[in-house]
From Swiss-Prot:
This is Probable Xaa-Pro aminopeptidase P. Mn(2+) 1 binds at D426, E524, E538. Binds 2 manganese ions per subunit. The keyword Manganese applies.
């Protein structure tokens, strides 16, 4: 992690702000599709601030600059930001949200500007109200992105990668029935159509996959679905011949990506009652999700012309069908085999001093081991390969010229995942190749107990991830410890590794989203000792119905089915802290791992010996 000088960039940006009578300028992380992970061409916030984390918002005034981010990135931001920037640690006591900070800077009649394609319509409305409540002038839409103007010719070009059709043997469902179900929802909500701008929703709905955003098999696009038509806005030259044929077969029209705003304006006008029809005529409305950009909402007619709803596509995508669930099981077995081979190899290299390996070299080896497995497409995010103090940086990103050497005396954390045609993986294991300290063993075991407790939880249908979160934190809480990140996130099926709407954590949003059978989530408690070590244990699990002796309130009861097939680190487990039930759970899990993965290592004595050692009964 490096600090980048931003003085010249900020000076140029402020000049552009003054020329447009803007006193405060907002630079979000997201792209025009509200993507969590973005293409390099959309990395505006990183360019202007120097902060490379995946979450955060930059706000620039004529004499100040602030970067707001969450607890996952406090250490990273503190390292990467130069002295032009104030770090707003979101969620910390007495620290304003970036919206509050922005409104405070606008006090006294000042004007706030933003690129309207990068802020959702709901965020824009809430921010306008906050700005005016503090005596600010207004939030205004600036069509020219000012950071792009500063970036100039050095800005990366927009990717235009091929788009492939995902066959039914992987997707489990064709587009036509997906569209039928969506139209049934729209009919119930009495809206004319639904405008979709979220990339993974479009990829899922049309059974297409791309690579416009690194690690995310999505492509730049929009879609409009009405009772009679489905239109995909995309660069048609990117579509494979098979994709073209599939879309035609499923009655999907294709329009240029750039036409969405012009077509939206035309569509919105066509839905307005004419003078002949009179004001009594029934107004037809379009629906958008709460992630739709302010710019697109304005093109569709703004308030009164559209209804903002919870995306029915997002909800449907989160409930995996049986084909997708079986794909998740199978890809995690193959992925587990790759990780087991990697950890056995890495321990042999490090503990026996066969080679000097840094964090990047180790991560490259892991990618190569994954790549040999069936249906491998690529990684699902940049591998977090972190040793010692680097492991305490929650979203650490190793770089070749500055990363650390892996040694046998420090904790090693590996958070990694892959994209397979039949599913998406995400696994974290923390290991030690020598003799860990008692503090490290205790911390690891407390995290492990939380991981197991949540995995073993049984709960009534309707329970949210917010309610389940304490299962994972309870043992750390008993010691006055905690971690600054969520406990779980939804996972896509050969889609984004972070997928809504579900999650497990303390965010208010999770209190309104019940977990349901077919959901796939991570379970990943952790503990981080700044400057020393970090521990995280992550499994992927599927929500399923379970049998219980009783069914209070006639509600089904739910539980988890874990699909990650990688053993925990025996050296780091303090058995004296485990209950008999926890030991039995570990034994059952280890037997399952051994049964599912040992077939990959018939001719690999090193890996097989490591696997048998790590899965011995407790």
């Amino acid at each position: 992690m490096k600090t980048v000088s931003t003085s010249d960039r900020l000076a140029e940006l402020r000049g552009l702000m003054r020329a447009r009578s803007i006193d405060v300028y907002i630079v979000p992380t997201e792209d025009a599709h509200s993507s969590e992970y973005i293409a390099p061409c959309d990395g505006r916030r990183e360019f202007i601030s120097g902060f490379s984390g995946s979450a955060g918002t930059a706000v620039v005034t004529n004499d100040k600059a602030a970067l707001a981010t969450d607890g996952r990135y406090f250490n990273q931001a503190a390292t990467e930001l130069d002295n032009n920037w104030e770090l707003l640690k979101q969620g910390q006591p007495d620290v304003p949200t970036w919206q509050e900070w922005t409104a405070d800077q606008a006090a006294g009649g000042k004007t706030v500007g933003v690129d309207p394609t990068l802020l959702s319509s709901s965020e824009a409305k809430a921010l306008q109200e906050k700005i005016k409540s503090k005596g600010g002038n207004d939030l205004v839409a600036i069509s020219d992105n000012l950071v792009d103007l500063v970036w100039g010719r050095h800005k990366p070009s927009r990717p235009s990668n091929p788009i492939a059709f995902l066959p039914k043997k992987y997707s489990g469902k064709d587009t036509e029935p997906k569209l039928k179900e969506l139209r049934e929802v729209l009919e119930k909500k009495k809206v004319f159509g639904f405008v979709i701008s979220t990339l993974d929703e479009i990829a899922w709905l049309f059974n297409l996959r791309g690579s416009d955003i690194p690690y995310n098999p999505v492509f730049f696009s929009y879609a409009v679905v009405t009772a009679d038509n489905a239109t995909l806005y995309v660069d048609a030259s990117k579509l494979s011949e098979e994709s073209h044929a599939y879309l035609k077969e499923n009655k999907v029209d294709i329009r240029p990506y750039e036409s969405i705003f012009e077509d939206s304006e035309v569509l919105a006008k066509s839905l307005k009652p004419t003078e002949d029809q009179g004001e009594e005529s029934k107004v037809k409305k379009l629906a958008i999700s709460n992630k739709t950009s302010w710019a697109l909402k304005l093109a569709l007619g703004g308030d009164g012309a559209v209804d903002e709803i919870k995306s029915p596509v997002c909800d449907a995508k989160a409930i995996k069908n049986e084909t997708e669930l079986e794909g998740m099981r199978q890809c995690h077995i193959r992925d587990g085999a790759a990780l087991i081979e990697y950890f056995a190899w890495l321990e042999d290299q490090v503990a026996n001093k066969k080679a000097t390996l840094n964090e990047v070299q180790a991560a490259t080896k892991l990618e190569n081991l994954r790549a040999k497995h069936e249906d491998f497409v690529g990684l699902s995010f940049t591998t977090i390969s972190a040793v010692g103090a680097n492991a305490a940086v929650i979203h650490y990103k190793p770089e070749e010229d500055s990363c650390a050497t892996i040694d046998a005396d420090s904790v090693y954390l590996c958070d990694s995942g892959a994209q397979f045609l039949d599913g998406t993986t995400d696994t974290t294991r923390t290991l030690h190749f020598g003799k860990p300290s008692e503090a490290e063993r205790k911390a690891y075991t407390l995290v492990l107990k939380g991981n197991m407790a949540l995995d073993m939880a049984i709960f009534p249908k309707g329970t949210t991830g917010f309610a389940l979160d304490p299962f994972a934190r309870q043992f750390l809480w008993q010691e006055g410890l905690d971690y600054r990140h969520g406990t779980g996130h939804g996972v896509g099926s050969y889609l984004n590794v972070h997928e809504g709407p579900i999650g497990i954590g303390t965010r208010k949003h999770y209190a309104g989203v019940p977990l349901a059978p077919g959901n796939v989530t991570s379970i990943e408690p952790g503990f981080y000792e700044d400057g020393s070590y970090g521990i995280r244990i992550e499994n992927i699990a599927m929500i399923r119905e379970v049998e219980t002796k009783h069914m209070f309130g006639d509600k089904p009861y739910l539980g988890f089915e874990h699909v990650t097939m990688v053993p925990y680190c025996r050296r780091l487990i303090d058995e004296s802290l485990l209950t008999p039930r926890e030991k039995q759970w570990l034994n059952d899990y280890n037997k399952l791992i051994l049964d599912k993965t040992s077939g990959f290592f018939k001719d690999d004595n090193l890996t097989m010996a490591w696997l048998e050692r790590e899965t011995q009964p407790y």
